[in-house]
């Protein structure tokens, strides 16, 4: 028999309120993702996933990511949405062409890589290109790095060329934006809310080890060079050291390039499948490692944020006590 709220006991009301609160908390991230209401992405409530099974967590995370991506896409200006659609169509067309003409394409890649390897000017050209893609908003760093692997394979020669061009370009970009384009560097910091969080960490700890950790996180290469220059207290020396100690990761690009070259040299299906699987596994491991470092650093940011809030609360209580 139905009852109204007047007939409910206090305990029943508490249970109802707690259930509604739990429902709101569970659905809050999804609502945030589709833009209904909620706080910033960095304020996600991880407790919503606590009682879910691994499969439920995977589906929940996938749906939430799709909602966020769709909401972000719809919030973009019309010309940017058009560019994304055109880029997606271009990728699909290139993928189809690769499936149809993959033998001819790989043969041409092999021929070009051998030709460039024999030219003495290739080293200088690669160094210049790698140097300039370090300046925002230039793009193409991953392409050039993989091309270095195509030409020289996994070798000290290839690593040295790639490392020298990357480090000098990054340091030069950092120096220019720090001393000549500082206002532009500060704008780059605020272009991404996640990068703002890292900027807060670097203001607390601007050591070369923390900078190296940031260099391993999944941020755009050239934009990171300019944005770090907008963070107060970071020296050219520490930035240079951070870039040098992260050069071993460049071997990943060389390995991928070498595997692509090997696919062009060996026409057997089994060998190509092995090379392709090797590339995919390498990319997955590299991506997972980068995101793991990102989330670990994000946790550090949350700790610093909580410490700052606690210190402010303590200071306010002391002021109130003195009054």
From Swiss-Prot:
The keyword Transmembrane helix applies. Its main location: Golgi. Residues 1-81, 145-148, 259-272 are lumenal. GO terms for cellular component: Golgi membrane. It is a multi-pass membrane protein. Keywords: Golgi apparatus, Membrane, Transmembrane, Transmembrane helix. GO terms for biological process: mitotic spindle elongation; vesicle-mediated transport. The VTT domain was previously called the SNARE-assoc domain. As there is no evidence that this domain associates with SNARE proteins, it was renamed as VMP1, TMEM41, and TVP38 (VTT) domain. It comes from the Eukaryota. This is Golgi apparatus membrane protein TVP38. Pfam families: VTT_dom. Golgi membrane protein involved in vesicular trafficking and spindle migration. Signal peptide: none annotated. Residues 149-260 are annotated as: VTT domain. Belongs to the TVP38/TMEM64 family. It is found in: Golgi apparatus membrane. Residues 103-123, 170-237, 294-323 are cytoplasmic. The chain crosses the membrane at residues 82-102, 124-144, 149-169, 238-258, 273-293. It comes from Candida glabrata (strain ATCC 2001 / BCRC 20586 / JCM 3761 / NBRC 0622 / NRRL Y-65 / CBS 138).
